């Protein structure tokens, strides 16, 4: 994987930094694992904007990724190829199982075409294999971690993400997440060994606003540039600083204000994130 800085042949190329991976499949994705993906423009069924800054962008197909990996225990799979997925920052791997079925999974770092992967209690400890947390040695790096047995991976799914298994006590294991948070997870939950691929994703630079628009992201207007009717920071004579601590358009504190309010799962957090 190489980091390529473009020559400034035009204003739109001047700040472009690309992450080039020669191993990525250059053809079409596996058609049976594709689904239609409709665009909402950030609107709900009433036509009202529920998520700002969404709209436009290139047409995409959704890739059906297997986040559970619990119904192919003991069946060996060969990595056919590593593919780009427009729906996520990580790459995906197309697996061909010994029974003839093909599935996509999140591609682990270091796994390439031709590698053998397997899931289940007897799977060897190597990147890409999926096991229950109780079968994974303490100190191992994992990703694609379940929070409820059988629900599928919910933690550490984006590019370069991982967590470290640091303790095992009773029916729980303790994980240290990249954020610094330490939390308990049931040892029956599954995880995949290793870290997620495409860890260089954070080094890329799109270089121009249009590249963001291709991805379906619309501009973000500052509150201080609005009228008082549109935002708490709006209005004023001439340029102003807003006159108060940063808030959202609805008056809630933003830019670093804590928003977590799930007391039900607080007991699972051993140490809050940094």
Swiss-Prot record:
One of the primary rRNA binding proteins. Required for association of the 30S and 50S subunits to form the 70S ribosome, for tRNA binding and peptide bond formation. It has been suggested to have peptidyltransferase activity; this is somewhat controversial. Makes several contacts with the 16S rRNA in the 70S ribosome. Residues 28-54, 224-274 are annotated as: Disordered. The gene is rplB. One of its GO terms (cellular component) is large ribosomal subunit. GO terms for molecular function: rRNA binding; structural constituent of ribosome; transferase activity. PANTHER family: LARGE RIBOSOMAL SUBUNIT PROTEIN UL2M, RIBOSOMAL PROTEIN L2. This is Large ribosomal subunit protein uL2. Part of the 50S ribosomal subunit. Forms a bridge to the 30S subunit in the 70S ribosome. Belongs to the universal ribosomal protein uL2 family. GO terms for biological process: cytoplasmic translation. InterPro entries: NA-bd_OB-fold, Rib_uL2_dom2, Ribosomal_uL2, Ribosomal_uL2_bac/org-type, Ribosomal_uL2_C, Ribosomal_uL2_CS, Ribosomal_uL2_dom3, Ribosomal_uL2_RNA-bd_dom. Residues 263-274 have a biased composition (Basic and acidic residues). HAMAP family: Ribosomal_uL2_B. SMART domains: Ribosomal_L2, Ribosomal_L2_C.
């Amino acid at each position: 994987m190489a980091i390529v800085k473009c020559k400034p042949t035009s204003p739109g190329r001047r700040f472009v930094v690309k992450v080039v991976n020669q191993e990525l499949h250059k053809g079409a994705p596996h058609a049976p694992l594709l689904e239609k993906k409709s665009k909402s423009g950030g609107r709900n069924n009433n036509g009202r904007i529920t998520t700002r800054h969404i709209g436009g962008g290139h047409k995409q197909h959704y890739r059906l990724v297997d986040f559970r990996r619990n119904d192919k225990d003991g069946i060996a799979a060969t990595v056919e190829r590593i593919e780009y997925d427009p729906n996520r920052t990580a790459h995906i791997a197309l697996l061909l199982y010994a029974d003839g079925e093909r599935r996509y999974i999140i591609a682990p770092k270091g796994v390439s075409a031709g590698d053998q992967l397997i899931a289940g209690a007897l799977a060897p400890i190597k990147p890409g294999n999926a096991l229950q947390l109780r079968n994974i040695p303490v100190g191992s790096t994992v990703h694609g971690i379940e929070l409820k047995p059988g629900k599928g991976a919910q933690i550490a799914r984006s590019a370069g993400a991982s967590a470290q298994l640091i303790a095992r006590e009773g029916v729980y294991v303790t994980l240290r997440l990249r954020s610094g948070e330490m939390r308990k997870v049931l040892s029956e939950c599954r995880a995949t060994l290793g870290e997620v691929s495409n860890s260089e994703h954070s080094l890329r630079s799109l270089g121009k606003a249009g590249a963001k628009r291709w991805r379906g992201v619309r501009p973000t207007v500052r509150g201080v540039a609005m009228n008082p009717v549109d935002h708490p920071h709006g209005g004023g004579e001439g340029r102003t600083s807003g006159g108060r601590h940063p808030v959202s358009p609805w008056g809630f504190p933003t830019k670093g204000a804590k928003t977590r309010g799930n007391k039900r799962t607080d007991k699972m957090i051993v140490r809050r994130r940094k």
